[in-house]
Design a protein with these regions (language model features):
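N-terminal Lys/Arg-rich, disordered targeting/topogenic segments
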Residues: 1-18
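Non-catalytic tandem-repeat scaffold regions and their flanking low-complexity/translocation tails
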Residues: 38-379
Length: 379
């Protein structure tokens, strides 16, 4: 395969497809690196603050690929040294350890959960200490603790108030999005991974935009928990690859399909070409978002396949060019660009991908996606 975008070039059609799909809501994002990189992480461990050894746990050697070791390491760092110290250590390990790089989003969930415990479940206090590193997982994890602390008896009457502070500060800002998305994760924990009950809880939110973001957290958690031995997902079916997306309300279908590709890839042995074909069978209005989901997964996989920006760009191009239609390829690149920015909280890797594309129209369209998405994240 050539370094450029299409051998199957169709004039300016790729650019035309790029021009609209940067408008996808920020909350419509990948199901994260967990399943794609075979890192299985299950429910949060809401560990109370303890007087543990202030020196971080050593997760090297035989524990170098032990998620529970790193989880405890960062929880202890939060309790003993603070959130800033935990992130400083995580960023250092991210640069050195491939396992940490691959599981970074869920490790930031752990930091967020511990921070919310430390700050008594107060959203403004917890968020004031936050960091967007590795896909804003800190804020999602924080909301898992907040929802758990409120409890099932009061959560529906309190749901609209949970994200009041970030909503009032700037409606639909990144903090507001992370709060609403995190509620979805929290509801799944509260209701024992019951997808439809958790979606009903999202439905208790007054704003349609918040409901959509919340549902994204629900679907992300559903995919993650497929192999959870203590509480496996009941809402994934190997013989119905699009379920539960086919059964949810229309307002929740896009957040579902964009994450469902992660599960579909696993069931197809990480064969992207086969999943491109499956996405082509999705109900018409949601076929494009399925391709965007594949782009998210392509970007996630690239962190495993390459260590340099150029390697990542090559890996993503190789995947997205498996799409047989212009729409499939262009939406895949859109998803990849957004996921790279989402993960790294900058546009360096995304721009490297865009600059590798040909023809010029495709490169320009890709750069527009990157520019607009960066602006959206900075609101």
């Amino acid at each position: 395969m050539s370094c450029g975008v299409p051998d199957r070039q169709e004039g300016g059609h790729i650019s035309a497809n790029f021009n609209k799909w940067w408008l996808l809501p920020l909350g419509i994002l990948t199901a994260s690196a967990l399943t794609a990189l075979n890192i299985l992480v299950f429910g949060p461990s809401f560990i109370q603050q303890t007087a543990s050894n202030p020196s971080p746990i050593d997760c090297s050697g035989p524990k170098a690929n032990d998620f529970s070791c790193y989880q405890k390491r960062y929880e202890d760092l939060v309790y003993n040294s603070g959130v800033e110290a935990a992130f400083a250590d995580l960023k250092d390990q991210f640069a050195k350890e491939q396992f940490v790089k691959a599981s970074c989003h869920q490790l930031t969930h752990s930091i967020g959960r511990a921070a919310a415990e430390l700050y008594g479940g107060d959203v403004p206090s917890t968020y004031s200490q936050g960091d967007d590193f590795c896909g804003s997982g800190y804020y999602h994890g924080a909301m898992q603790t907040v929802v758990a602390n409120i409890g099932a008896d009061k959560i529906l009457e309190e749901a609209d108030n949970i994200c009041a502070a970030p909503r009032e500060e700037q409606d639909q800002s990144l903090d507001h999005r992370n709060c609403a998305h995190g509620m979805g994760h929290g509801f799944m924990g509260l209701y024992g991974n019951e997808v439809f009950e958790s979606l009903e809880a999202c439905g208790a939110l007054s704003e349609g935009w918040e409901r959509e973001q919340c549902s994204g957290g629900v679907f992300m958690e559903n995919v993650i928990d497929e192999d959870n031995p203590s509480n496996p997902s009941k809402y994934l079916k190997a013989d119905e690859p699009f379920y539960p997306c086919t059964e949810v309300k229309t307002e929740y279908k896009s957040p579902c399909y964009v994450r469902q590709t992660n599960y579909m890839l696993k069931k197809q042995g990480e064969d992207f070409a086969k999943v491109f074909e499956l996405c082509g069978k999705v109900e018409d209005d949601f076929r494009p978002i399925c391709y965007v989901g594949l782009g998210n997964n392509a970007a996630t996989q690239s962190t495993k396949n390459g260590t340099t920006d150029g390697d990542q760009a090559d890996s993503i191009r190789g995947v997205c060019m498996l799409g047989q239609e212009t729409e499939a390829r262009s939406k895949c690149f859109v998803g990849a660009v957004r996921q790279l920015i989402f993960n790294y909280d900058n546009d360096v890797q995304a721009k490297a991908l865009c600059e590798s594309l040909t023809p010029t129209a495709a490169r320009a369209g890709c750069l527009q996606v990157s520019e607009e998405y960066m602006a959206e994240r900075r609101r």
